[in-house]
Amino acid sequence: MTEALYFLDCYLKEFEATVEKVTEGKYIVLDRTAFYPESGGQPSDTGKLVRERDGAEFKVVYAGKFNGDISHEISPEGETGAEGLKVGDKVKGIIDWDRRYRHMRMHTATHVIANVIEKEAGAQITGNQLGLDQSRVDFSLEAFDREKFAEYEKIANEIIAENHSVNLYLVSRKEAEERLSRLTTLAKGFSEEITEVRLVEIEGVTIEACGGSHLKNTGEIKGIKIEKLQNKGKSNRRMYFSLLDQASGLK
């Protein structure tokens, strides 16, 4: 099983690792990685692997988790035409930091605005999808008062400006269940097969189980703007938002 370095240090930009498995010349499993694999509505990290012995670089275009292993999809050969990676090769992993940091800001922002919608409207969060420029939150809500979302945006931005610390904890599922009334805001909850849980606490705001990458404090979000609201039928609603410094003003 790959050691997930991003679990407790989301700011790790580079790391050293050893190649443990190579499939079809382009799917690489390392003993440890800081690359976040696509999951939980958060896209994967990208970046590159640099082989220690000759400096050959391999672009990482996707990372995914399969049976406990995190697989990195790379260009089959080095950008300089070098031979492909082999089991036992020592590599340095380098994360595309701009992409990672954008997703970190989006993910922590999602926790803030989702918590506000839950508390203020009594909504139940049913899904989410992060993007570099815009993210969405899906929720179940019978009475859909669009006018109130301007107030929810204001409350979320007040929380962001208060610069709450964000803490990460890795605990057993039993301990998590003892500490929390629920493991996640998502209605579907967590699989019973999960025995170890990573908790994300925004001090004074919310604490829940989440495996994504997050900021150290809410101030780094800077602010959000709700861009669009959609009625998806019955009680299904969808909200799109962007980071304030990237807001497009879509309606």
UniProtKB/Swiss-Prot annotation:
The positions annotated for binding Zn(2+) are: 107, 111, 210, 214
User: What would you give as a GO molecular function for this chain, any one?
Assistant: nucleic acid binding
User: Which branch of life, at top level?
Assistant: Archaea
Which keywords fit this entry according to its UniProt record? Cytoplasm, Metal-binding, Protein biosynthesis, Zinc
Q: Which InterPro entries match?
A: Ala-tRNA-synth_IIc_core, Ala-tRNA-synth_IIc_N, Alanyl-tRNA_Edit-Domain, Alanyl-tRNA_Editing_Enzymes, Thr/Ala-tRNA-synth_IIc_edit, Transl_B-barrel_sf, tRNA_SAD
Residue stretches in coiled coil: none
- SUPFAM superfamilies attached to this UniProt entry: ThrRS/AlaRS common domain, Translation proteins
Report if keyword Lyase is assigned: no
A GO BP annotation = alanyl-tRNA aminoacylation
List cofactor names only.
Answer: Zn(2+)
What residue intervals traverse the membrane? Answer: none
Effect of altering residue 232 to A?
A: Severe reduction in removal of mischarged Ser from Ser-tRNA(Ala)
Q: Where in the cell is it found?
A: Cytoplasm
**Predominant subcellular localization, coarse grouping:** cytoplasm
Instruction: Describe cofactor binding as the record notes it.
Output: Binds 1 zinc ion per subunit.
Q: Name one GO cellular component term.
A: cytoplasm
Q: What does this protein do?
A: Functions in trans to edit the amino acid moiety from mischarged Ser-tRNA(Ala). Recognition depends, at least in part, on the acceptor stem of tRNA(Ala).
Q: Which family does it belong to?
A: Belongs to the class-II aminoacyl-tRNA synthetase family. Editing domain AlaX-M subfamily.
Report what the protein is called.
Alanyl-tRNA editing protein AlaX-M
Organism (species): Methanosarcina mazei (strain ATCC BAA-159 / DSM 3647 / Goe1 / Go1 / JCM 11833 / OCM 88) (Methanosarcina frisia)
